[in-house]
């Protein structure tokens, strides 16, 4: 039936179908498949499908496929060029596979259940995005529908309603939760009540789900009742009240459960309750109860019933159900479970029944839980009392009737319990009688059609028929409103009205409900007689029919299809009678809660005969619901279940298409098609079809006139031109596309012709250039050959000339050789003389080396001796120090004496070793002196011999010069040579003897050295022992001081006047006070031949006391300081004066070393008062500079000394003595101080204030950026004659730059440390990065080429600002924009279709997540060049890599706290020199602050 709706559209499209067209054809499995037309034979069309098979279809059953639809589909299906059934189905399917589960059809939202968690779609950030956004501005979402309803209610003062429908498992309940969550967020109260209305509304969902939801075949959490939540708002738009209306609870499920379904959740939760609750209610495993074990499904995967029980109890407390009422509710639930285990057997009489022996315990437990009489409960189940005018008759029931009575009691009790819970929630939340505006959320069951359809399906489908009638009327109204808004001419649209089906069901006389009520009033009526009555009465109604193979079923032709109902249970389920015995039994219960569930009937005996049925009550409720909806402005959400497997990423075409038909979506499309189904904005229309008449576009600058002229030029009739859109009849879009295809085809032919001509000409030019090049190469080769011959002739002449020259030179060389030989013979004689002279030089070098070695060994020995003497001196000094420090020790005198004896013994041993070592050194010195004398004598003889030899050599030289040289026969003075030779031999023997003596001396020296090293080692061991004794002595002194301090404390507590001992003060005096007695100059340390122990200056008790005490400042001084620094005292040498002044005063007053002082508290209060004005950035920057500088000085000077801590006594080193007294002025300005707890606490408070001021400044900048960022994200658009979009340069990015410059100038004027400025700007750029990047992956309009160019220009301005600001203040701010820079870079790439996934993930956008890649690729669009996004293979690769996590948004730091590292602060201020900083001038005039001068 629905296929015929589009037949006329398909017929019009068929006339334009040609070979090569891409069309949709019907398929029995996939519903619709696409393919290419390969043959057209009249009405028959042969299509080659993409699946591989060939199909022959009628033209009336084919639809054109829009090839320009993006791979990710469109947000609003009314913008599809071809609005037909396969196009709608394909759009939903393509969006579903990329997790875009929401799609608009006009103002109707279609939600496809993803069957997986998508938490990123419903967080607070998404709520903030949709707040105040127009419908359609952002991606489709339930938040957008809720926001539109809320805004319309506030602006127009009209109540709204949101209707959520769909079949079981489609996600209606979750969607309704999201709607109420958003409305509660929008209408939440500012004050924090104990239980706000919005909290109670939200927490009512888990309570109602526990008692009204169950697992069905299609859904694990199916609502078995309808729910309409009315949320009331006051005049300010805040929630002021709420009410919950429920419809048609499925009572039969309490007693009958099909496999693999479950009963209501509350039963299983109670069986999983804590042991004490189960023991109290006598519950065991759920498989032991008949009402639960009818199905094998007891537990749900991923659901912990024990945790759900706890959550339900908490939710019940929030909605106003106290603990006592909760206990009573679950007592009733447990009683129903025990009641179901009661079984009956035949009693003493044939038609009587009694409980079986096994069931009596359950009867007893049920009576205890109901708090009624056990026998009365048994009689109410097994007997009936009939009252006649004459007498009262008691009639027994057979076992079957007793079982039915038991089930009726269970259903009756559960129904009353559910109604009580709903009323309790309503009473607890409360309704606002003064409220005029409300938003209703209807969570209602969708159209149902199963193999077996009973009374519940009949009522559900009746509800959907009524809602469909309301829905169709509203859709038609919206369609006509748009026509009126666009001011086009239109005629009345005819649409199918299902009022005839409603009359069939609801007609007062002869309707199905009327006939059903009539049958229920007669006791002897059965479902067969009821069915026969239906056949006789409604046989002529075309919407009613009787199945051929059934005698009791009937079929109704609903708007969504034919449904066959089985009448077997209709009569029983329609009866709403109350058994008097049950009413009396439970009304008399001793439990006030249970008795309250069954109040006595107020009707008299005459009114009891009036019949009331479930169908009639439901009909009245439904009429009341529709009447309430008619007074509101409706909004529709249609939920679709994509598959029956309840698994993600599976989209079943047939199943989804049937739900779209049942949900009225296809009917909406048919109503739209009855008028003008295709509507395009002027710019979109001109972008697509402007090529049909480009001349008209060039002449016209008016979009409307251009569209009209274009349509008239192509000869299209029946169109309408509105104010902003072009309206086309069905089939006209296909005709325009055919014209456009023809124009593109002709243009392609021209382009090919031009291109082929270009290729041919290029080939000719290439051949001509090649011929010219070949000729040139040949001519060059001939010329080179000729040149080579000429070069060879010239070379031959040169060779001949060179040969003649060579022969002449050879002759001259022979003559020169003879001359050289004569000179060489003379040279040989001179070489012999030089060799002897060299030997003499070697001997001299050996002697000099020997002297140097002896000198080195002498120095080494002296150094060892000096070191030994120095270590002994230090040991003796430490011994004297220990003796002096232990002089006043009385209690530990014995220990000291024993230690002193050990020290003396070790000292004696050390002195003995030293004396032995000195004796050895003396003997070695004497022996070395003898050897030295011998060596000097030998050297003296050697010198004399050398002098004589030199004289003889000189004489020989003179003689040689006088006597002429005989050629080739040298004359040698043999006598002189023999003399020299003998002298040389003597010298050699002398040197040999000296070397032997030196070797012996070295051996003795090595033995002496070993002995000395052993003795030195023993001396070091002795020193270690002395150090250990010194440490032990120090520990004893510490214990002694603790004892003395305790004694002093006890004396002070007893005596009125405190007594302070000088010794205690002396012992607690820091060691640094004694350093003044050490060396003060380098001369005093190095004077004299020996090192002497420095004198020790003992201080008197009064001096020590004055140095260690804290100078308490007068209150007037503190007030003067605070009054002075509270004002802006400015800066000196680029440093804050206030911070330096405070530090100097605290240092002088010794407040850092005080155990108790209130100065720090006064300063903290002063800083807190100074920064109260959070909007004044200049004041905040001034105090940020002061607090950070003061924190730096405290960090540099304060040391955690603790209370009563004693510095570790160390042996003073030579370096410390030498450097004592030499300090720079900067070191005097900031010097180390042993801080106490108040000072350390003040330092922590100061650090907190620095972070607080940083946070306030960042918060001010954040507010300023947020106001401008929303305008910077999307490029403004304008239209020009050629329908291209151009960018108008806006100043929004410049506003950001100016704001950053202003803040930077303020911070620099206050000399704020650069590291703090870097942190502020890093946070600012991080905010820009998060906002812009998130907008690109959430808003389709922003993810475009034109917007990428706009954002690129803004990023260039920010980069220029960072470069001008320099790294000192900007830091790594530019790196914070890495996500945005990569995303914008991707948008500006032209050939995205050729990019692979690896290039995107590794090269283009390495810092973006896979979900963000996916969003950018699917949302991208190009309005200028119409370039495509990435290929489907890349999309498929991303889909395969993506995990279940859908978190594609960057996280924004919502806190305003900027963490501070003191180390970073100190490193940035290491070059601070405070020596030249001037204190506050106002204090310089005060005599109390004379120390500041």
Swiss-Prot record:
Pfam families: DIL (PF01843), IQ (PF00612), Myosin_head (PF00063), Myosin_N (PF02736). Transmembrane segments: none annotated. GO terms for molecular function: actin binding; ATP binding; calmodulin binding; cytoskeletal motor activity. Keywords: Actin-binding, ATP-binding, Calmodulin-binding, Coiled coil, Motor protein, Myosin, Nucleotide-binding, Repeat. ATP binds at residues 166-173, 219-227. Residues 72-741 form the Myosin motor domain. Residues 18-67 form the Myosin N-terminal SH3-like domain. One of its GO terms (cellular component) is myosin complex. Residues 1102-1114 have a biased composition (Basic and acidic residues). Residues 889-1057 form a coiled coil. The keyword Coiled coil applies. Residues 1085-1114 are annotated as: Disordered. It comes from the Eukaryota. Residues 504-538, 540-563, 598-622, 622-644 are annotated as: Actin-binding. One of its GO terms (biological process) is actin filament organization. Residues 744-773, 767-796, 792-821, 813-842, 836-865, 859-888 form the IQ domain. SUPFAM superfamilies: P-loop containing nucleoside triphosphate hydrolases. Residues 1161-1444 form the Dilute domain. Myosin heavy chain that is required for the cell cycle-regulated transport of various organelles and proteins for their segregation. Functions by binding with its tail domain to receptor proteins on organelles and exerting force with its N-terminal motor domain against actin filaments, thereby transporting its cargo along polarized actin cables. IQ domain mediates interaction with calmodulin. Homodimer. Belongs to the TRAFAC class myosin-kinesin ATPase superfamily. Myosin family. Plant myosin class XI subfamily. This is Myosin-13.
